[in-house]
C-alpha cells in the first residue's frame, strides 16, 4: 500500500513538473488572460451566433437542403460583429462556404462576388488564403461549364485555367508567408 501511495505521489509530481525552457510555454496549466487578449462579450455572442448558423448549415447540407444551408450561411454574414480580427475570419470562412454552396448550385457569378467581398480584406490570414482557393475552384467550375457549353472556346478555357492557377498560387503565397511568420515567432 505504501508503494502505491508513493507511486501515485511520484506520478502526480512528474505531471506537474516543468520541463524545458520557461519560454516554451510549459509552465502552469492555468494562466491569467492578458486583458489585451481577452474577447469581449459582444464578440463572444456574435461568434456563438455564427457557430450556431454554421451548424444549422451543416445539418441542412447533410439533408440535401442546399437552399436552407445557403440561407443559414447568409445569416452569418448578416451578424453585427464588433470590430475584431476574429469577426473578419468568421465572415471570410462563411464566404468560402457560401461560395462553394453557390458553385454547387451553378451560381458561379454570385459565388465569385461573394469571394471578392472577402478578398477586399486588408489582413492576410488563413481564411483569406482559403478564399483564394475557392476563387480558383470557381475558375475551374467556369472552365468545366464553358467546355460543356462551347468546346470551341479554347482561349476562354485557357484563360479560366490560368486564373485558377493564379488564385491557387496566391493562396499558397499567403499560407507560406503566414507559416514563415509563425516559424519566426517560435
Predicted feature residues:
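Alpha-helical segment of the N-proximal tetratricopeptide repeat
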Residues: 43-79
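"A position-specific structural signal for the A-helix of alpha-solenoid helical repeats
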Residues: 48-51, 55, 90, 97, ...
